[in-house]
């Protein structure tokens, strides 16, 4: 299937890799189908691209590559709605806000994208935890005193 991407232009995608967001994304409830596209120049970052709207795309990254101690629990409703049966089937990404210069860019740890990769079901999961920011630095977090 051919789609248009504001970041990558015209691109062929595998329809089996289309992610279903049954509730859409916050602010984009009508957009329910997205695909993760690789950024060839930098495998650490990806594009979460709407299948139907070329202008709706987010740069995402694996938050664990930057914040190794990042952790949270999913509620039962989310586990059921995403049909999660095994932790191994789950992928977590954080949406980035790109800034100039790039090292000032941030990631949203407060509302990660949670994906059941086996079922291709996903949602943006808003955490009710004060310890995570929606504008966390992409710079490695400072070590705690004594580390």
UniProtKB/Swiss-Prot annotation:
Q: Where in the cell is it found?
A: Cytoplasm
Q: Which Pfam families match?
A: FliW
> What's one GO BP annotation on this UniProt entry?
bacterial-type flagellum assembly
InterPro entries documented for this protein: Flagellar_assembly_factor_FliW, Flagellar_assmbl_FliW_dom_sf
Q: Which UniProt keywords apply?
A: Bacterial flagellum biogenesis, Chaperone, Cytoplasm, Translation regulation
For this record, the Gene Ontology CC terms, alphabetical, are: cytoplasm
Cited HAMAP family: FliW
Q: How does it assemble?
A: Interacts with translational regulator CsrA and flagellin(s).
* Homology family: Belongs to the FliW family.
What role does it play? Answer: Acts as an anti-CsrA protein, binds CsrA and prevents it from repressing translation of its target genes, one of which is flagellin. Binds to flagellin and participates in the assembly of the flagellum.
Q: Mind telling me what this protein is named?
A: Flagellar assembly factor FliW
Organism (species): Oceanobacillus iheyensis (strain DSM 14371 / CIP 107618 / JCM 11309 / KCTC 3954 / HTE831)
């Amino acid at each position: 299937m051919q789609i248009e991407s504001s970041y990558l232009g015209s691109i062929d995608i595998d329809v089996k890799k289309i992610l279903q967001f049954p509730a859409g994304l916050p602010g984009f409830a009508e957009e329910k189908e997205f695909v993760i596209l690789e950024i060839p120049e930098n495998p650490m970052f990806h594009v979460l691209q709407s299948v139907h709207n070329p202008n709706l795309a987010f740069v995402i990254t694996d938050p664990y590559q930057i914040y190794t101690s990042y952790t949270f629990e999913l509620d039962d409703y989310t586990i059921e709605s995403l049909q999660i049966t095994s932790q191994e089937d789950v992928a977590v990404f954080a949406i980035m806000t790109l800034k100039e210069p790039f090292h000032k860019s941030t990631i949203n740890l407060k509302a990660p994208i949670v994906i059941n990769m086996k079922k291709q079901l996903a949602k943006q999961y808003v955490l009710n935890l004060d310890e995570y920011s929606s504008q966390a630095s992409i710079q490695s977090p400072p070590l705690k005193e004594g580390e």
